[in-house]
C-alpha cells in the first residue's frame, strides 16, 4: 500500500469511526437512564452530515471508488440529530403507548415524512453526486437515460474495518459496536446476495440499531427497542421493522438546488404527492418540469431483508 493510500485510509477510517461514535451518542441521549447514562464522547453537532459535506471534495480527489465516503455519509444520515434513529424511537414509543395498529395512522405518516425529507437532503444531495451512474437495466435500449446507484461495499479493496481498539474504549462507557459475524467488516462480493452490517448497542438499555446496506443501491436501517409486552409492535415503522429505500435519477442531474435548499425540495415533494405506503414512487422535478429522480420506500421485516425493486419510474 502506497503512503498516500495509507494516509487516505487512516483519514477516512477516523471519519467513519467518528460517525459511529456520533450515532452512539445520539442513542445514549435518547435512551440512557439519567443516573447511569454513558458520558458523551463527542460534542453535539447538528446536523453532523454538514461536516461530511465540507470534506467531500477532498475525499473525491483521493478515493478510488468513493465507497468509504458513501458509508460515512450513510452513517451520518442515521446518526444526525435530525436523523431517523431518534425520531423513529420516539414514534415507536408514541405508537406503542397509544396502541395504534394501523400503518395509515399518524405514526406511519410521521415516520415516512421524516424519511422522505432526510433521505432527499442527505442521500440524494450527497451520495448521488459522487461519481458516475450506471443504467437501471442492461437491456435498456438507451443505456444511460436513468441510473441507479450501485453502493454495495463498506470498504475499498480488501481493507478491513477493525473495531477492536475502538470497542476497548467504548466498553468503558457501556457501549458496544459489533458485527453480525467476524467477516462483515471486510469488503464483500458486489452482489445483492451479500450485505454489510454493524450493530450499535447501548448496554444499559439494550437499545440497539442495525445498519445494513445491500447491493443494487438499497439500504435498510432497523431501530429495535425491546418492548416484548406489546403484541402488535411489528406494525410500527422503525420499531421492529426496517425501512428500505430504492431510487434512481436522471444521469446528469446532481440533485442539488442553486441555494442548497434540499429540505424545501423534500417538503414540496412530500406535500404534493403523498402516495401510498410501500407502493408509489415519490418523484422530484425541477421548476421547469424536468424530472430529477424517483424514490421508493418499503417497510420490511428483518427476516425479509433481501428483496429488491425492479426498474424505475422515470416520472413521465
Curated annotation (Swiss-Prot):
Residues 1-26 form the signal peptide. It is a multi-pass membrane protein. One of its GO terms (molecular function) is carbohydrate binding. One of its GO terms (cellular component) is membrane. Glycans are attached at residues 181, 203, 216. It is found in: Secreted; Host membrane. Keywords: Cleavage on pair of basic residues, Disulfide bond, Glycoprotein, Host membrane, Lectin, Membrane, Secreted, Signal, Toxin, Transmembrane, Transmembrane helix. The secreted toxin contains alpha and beta chains that are linked by three disulfide bonds. The killer phenotype requires the presence of two different dsRNA viruses: an L-A helper virus and the toxin-coding (M) killer virus. Killer strains of S.cerevisiae producing the toxin K1 kill sensitive cells but are resistant to their own toxin. The gamma and delta chains may play a role, on there own or as part of the protoxin, in the self-protection of the virus-infected killer yeast (toxin immunity). Ionophoric toxin secreted by an infected host and lethal to non-infected sensitive strains. Cell killing is achieved in a receptor-mediated process, requiring initial toxin binding to a cell wall (1->6)-beta-D-glucan and, probably, subsequent transfer to a plasma membrane receptor. K1 toxin disrupts the cell by creating a pore across the target cell membrane. This is M1-1 protoxin. It comes from Saccharomyces cerevisiae killer virus M1 (ScV-M1). The lineage of its organism: Viruses, Riboviria, dsRNA viruses.
